């Protein structure tokens, strides 16, 4: 039974997240329904990142085992045909070794968070960026962000319902980049805790507003307490942009 690697783009707005849930539609569920329509039997689709409700992806990676070998391009096109008109697109499909695992074979995940730092309402970026009307000091945000780089106990920045066995994670990158009225927060790690990126972003916005200093952010990290976290940024601005493999 051949295994396929899929690269998937989606608008997470209408979904309860990647993972199948009882309380609403999911990206995983939509893909599995499409695969079942093609193959005539239940197909499990496993993703590299279990994105939350409202979070988007430019290049989510998933794998699935298909009972018969199909040309990768044909599988891609068939999945896209069955997914329409949902905001999910299968960008590529390729046959990979049987031991490839989209989640467990990944060595790094890359996310971008978009902040629209302007007074005007959003028009084209509704549900795709977080509008923060107060002018943010992006340089101060970037400087403070470097305090979070490295291996730390990120209890402060993880959801209270996070099921990870350990709060320890190694953060490889956390850059704050301004381009006109848009601020992009770019972050990379092997893996992240539940709500870690959005928790870090919300706290960095407090730094940008002048409510916190870099020392305050470092103190919040050191507190290892969820109550020490700043606000959690909304899911609208978060994108899974790349997953790395050996």
Curated annotation (Swiss-Prot):
Record GO terms (molecular function): RNA binding; tRNA pseudouridine(38-40) synthase activity
Catalytic residues as annotated in Swiss-Prot or TrEMBL: 52 (nucleophile)
Entry binding sites for substrate: 111
Keywords recorded for this protein, A-Z: Isomerase, tRNA processing
InterPro entries: PsdUridine_synth_cat_dom_sf (IPR020103), PsdUridine_synth_TruA (IPR001406), PsdUridine_synth_TruA_a/b_dom (IPR020097), PsdUridine_synth_TruA_C (IPR020095), TruA/RsuA/RluB/E/F_N (IPR020094)
GO biological process, one term: tRNA pseudouridine synthesis
Disulfide bonds, paired cysteine numbers: none
Entry keyword Isomerase: yes
Source superkingdom: Bacteria
Segments traversing the membrane: none
Record family assignment: Belongs to the tRNA pseudouridine synthase TruA family.
Subunit structure: Homodimer.
Function statement: Formation of pseudouridine at positions 38, 39 and 40 in the anticodon stem and loop of transfer RNAs.
Identification of the protein by name: tRNA pseudouridine synthase A
Species whose genome carries this gene: Rhodopseudomonas palustris (strain BisA53)
Gene this protein is translated from: truA
């Amino acid at each position: 039974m051949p295994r396929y690697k899929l690269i998937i783009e989606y608008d997470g707005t209408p979904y309860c997240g990647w993972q199948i849930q009882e309380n609403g539609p999911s990206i995983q569920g939509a893909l599995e329904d499409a695969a079942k329509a093609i193959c005539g039997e239940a197909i499990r689709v496993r993703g590299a990142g279990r994105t939350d409700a409202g979070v988007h992806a430019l290049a989510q990676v998933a794998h699935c085992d298909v009972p018969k070998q199909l040309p990768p391009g044909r599988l891609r096109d068939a999945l896209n045909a069955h997914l329409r008109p949902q905001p999910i697109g299968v960008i590529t499909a390729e046959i990979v070794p049987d031991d490839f695992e989209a989640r467990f074979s990944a060595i790094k995940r890359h996310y971008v968070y978009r902040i629209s730092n302007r007074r005007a309402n959003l028009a084209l970026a509704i549900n795709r960026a977080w509008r923060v009307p107060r002018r943010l000091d992006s340089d101060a945000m970037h400087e403070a962000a470097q305090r979070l780089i490295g291996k730390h106990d990120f209890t402060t920045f993880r959801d209270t319902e996070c099921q990870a066995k350990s709060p320890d994670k190694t953060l490889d990158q956390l850059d704050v980049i301004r381009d006109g009225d848009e601020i992009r927060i770019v972050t990379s790690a092997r893996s992240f805790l539940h709500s870690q990126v959005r928790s870090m972003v919300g706290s960095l916005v407090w730094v940008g507003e002048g409510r916190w200093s870099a020392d305050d952010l470092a103190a919040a990290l050191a507190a290892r307490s969820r109550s020490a976290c700043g606000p959690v940024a909304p899911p609208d601005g978060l994108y899974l942009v790349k997953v790395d493999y050996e």
